[in-house]
Every structure is written in structure tokens, then in C-alpha cells.
């Protein structure tokens, strides 16, 4: 419910900021794939705006940031223009959202859950793009937003690889408690974790192995921590890992 309230207010702000009622707001990332922790942030993508290039995306980021700064529900608002896809990072105060929604009977949000981390990016949904997974990656494009495309890929992996979901959640939790889960600060993203696990399972033919999850976890860390030679080889999700 709190997530829906935050999304609704953000959508209203987007429509007001760009004076466009056709704008939509979609969820991608861990929330959409079912791989979210209790403390996971929400990844949102704004669609429906015409974006001709990176400069347009940055301009939209700045415009939206100004509108967020005037809203009492959001704080710690940052526009990261140098990211591969420009992004706004902010916190939503779920307690204030609840109080606004139901001022007469408002329950208290637990202190550690009160502030919801949200990332917002933009996608040009009015222009046809090539398919990343089936037509190849276009290295020279800065407009290609892969968040929505990756949802279907990750869900297919969860169905195909036994224990992928459990192993992903375990590793994400370990990264979270060590503050190593933010790629903007040198950490590892959820998608990066999934790619590493899939490559590992492919390499050792563990796609359908019904083994103890703890053994998989220990072997995973042993492989990447002790045996993987990052200066000689790379990580792939096809051709055996």
C-alpha cells in the first residue's frame, strides 16, 4: 500500500512537471521480478516523453528534481547525471504519506522502514528501439533503457534455474548489510548478482541440481573469491558461463 501511494504521488508530480497526462510510470528491477528484500529500493521508469538523446534525459532529470524538492514527502533528492542512464535518487517518507492518505487513523511505520529509497529514470517510449537480447546490443546508443526488458529475462531464469531465487536473495542480503549493493558507490547491482549466479551455474552445470542451498552459496563464494581469474576471463550467461 505504501509503495502504491508513493508511486501515485510521483506519477502526479511527473504529469504536472511536464504538463502531460499521457505519462506513465512503470516498476522494474527487484520489485518486479520478485527478488526484493524488505529494504530494497524501488526502480521506476517514466515513459511517454520524447527524448532525442542524453541531453534531453538530463534536462528532464533536472526539471523533475526541482518539483520533488518542493514536495514534503521526499528528501535526499539527488540527480546523478553522469550515470549510464541519468537517474534521480530520493527517499519517500512513508509515515507522511500514510498521514496524508488517512489523517484520522494512521498506523506508525517502523523506524527502519520509514524511508523508502526510490530511483527514477526515463525511457523514450515513442521511438522504436532494437531488442537488446535478441538483436544484439548497440554500444553507441545512450537511449536504450534495459530495465523493462530485463524483467522477462530474469523471470525466465528463475523458472529455469533451481535455487536461483534463494541464492540471489542470500547474496543480496549479505551485500546489503555490508553496504555493497549500490553500483553508484562501487557496489554490485541485483542484476549483476543474477548474471554472476547464472554464469556460475552454467559453468558447473547446476541449472537443475537439487543440492543444499548452503553448499551452493559456499561454492559460489569460493569460485569467485579464490578461483575466478578476472584478469584472464570474463563472465557470460551463454556458451557455458
Where are these regions (language model features)?
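Beta-strand elements of modular eukaryotic interaction domains
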Residues: 12-17, 23-24, 31-36, 52, ...
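Amphipathic alpha-helical interaction motifs in eukaryotic regulatory proteins
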Residues: 11-15, 19, 61-69, 85, ...
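Helical scaffold of the NTase/Pol beta-like nucleotidyltransferase catalytic core
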Residues: 1-27, 100
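Basic, alpha-helical interaction scaffolds
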Residues: 137-190
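Conserved catalytic core of two-metal-ion nucleotidyltransferases
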Residues: 59-133, 138
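Catalytic metal-binding acidic patch
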Residues: 29-69, 116-122, 197
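Structured beta-strand/turn binding interfaces of compact recognition modules in eukaryotic regulators
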Residues: 26-30, 45-49, 80-82, 91-93, ...
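Pol beta-like nucleotidyltransferase catalytic core
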Residues: 170-173, 187-189, 195-241
